């Protein structure tokens, strides 16, 4: 044991806890400054620091899209995000969870949100953006948002539909809603002929409500995390 002197130093010449704390605060402050960047005359946080801050403030399902998008656009690397965490004196568990599930192949925020909710509800993370080909002609049968393989050999596909696909002329190619629906059904048939067992369709409202979305996944037999360890990590 030792008694601190009035100047803050211990009698044995070592630093007191007060000095150590001040030093740590200074290091953290200097690290925070390095995490800032200037755009013109405006100082903003770097992409990596912004992602970390959001991960620590907001729910997983609302932040996964940010991580997916930043990785897809090449705004940040996983190593940069980890480096920010190394300089903080807080529990960065939520950040590392997001890094574990983040995937640059996710093409939009709706898909990321859908995937995040499925993970939160205990389902195995799906593979993303898989293309199927006809077993007969070899031609492309369709590119799907999400895919799961089950232990019994079934292939489950999930399509996340935004309302824009039915009303936006750029997405409908000027087809009316009835034609879009007919083409959608034909696409599902093509996918099944290419080996898909089940095609699930969902939308933003169902995912927000959760119960209808979860029921569809359960009825289709989407594997649960922990039940089939070899399928817990999407390729």
Predicted regions, residues:
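Surface segments flanking catalytic/ligand-binding clefts of nucleic-acid enzymes
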Residues: 71-235
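Phosphate-handling catalytic interfaces
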Residues: 1-115, 124-125
């Amino acid at each position: 044991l030792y008694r601190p002197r009035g100047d803050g130093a211990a009698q044995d010449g070592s630093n007191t806890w007060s000095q150590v704390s001040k030093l740590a605060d200074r290091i953290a402050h200097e690290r925070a400054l390095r995490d800032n960047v200037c755009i013109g005359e405006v100082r903003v946080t770097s992409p990596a620091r912004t992602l970390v801050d959001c991960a620590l403030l907001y729910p997983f399902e609302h932040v996964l899209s940010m991580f997916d998008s930043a990785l897809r656009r090449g705004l940040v690397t996983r190593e940069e995000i980890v480096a920010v965490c190394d300089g903080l004196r807080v529990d960065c568990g939520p950040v590392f969870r997001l890094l574990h599930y983040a995937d640059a192949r996710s093409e939009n925020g709706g898909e990321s949100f859908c995937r995040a909710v499925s993970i939160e509800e205990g389902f195995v993370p799906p593979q993303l953006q898989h293309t199927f080909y006809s077993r007969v002609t070899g031609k492309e049968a369709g590119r799907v948002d999400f895919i799961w393989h089950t232990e019994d050999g079934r292939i489950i596909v999930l399509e996340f539909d935004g309302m824009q696909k039915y009303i936006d002329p750029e997405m409908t190619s000027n087809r009316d809603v009835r034609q879009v629906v007919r083409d959608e059904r034909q696409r599902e048939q093509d996918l099944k002929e290419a080996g898909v067992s089940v095609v699930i369709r969902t939308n933003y409202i169902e995912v927000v409500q959760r119960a209808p979305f979860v029921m569809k996944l359960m009825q289709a037999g989407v594997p649960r995390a922990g039940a089939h360890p070899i399928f817990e990590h999407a390729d």
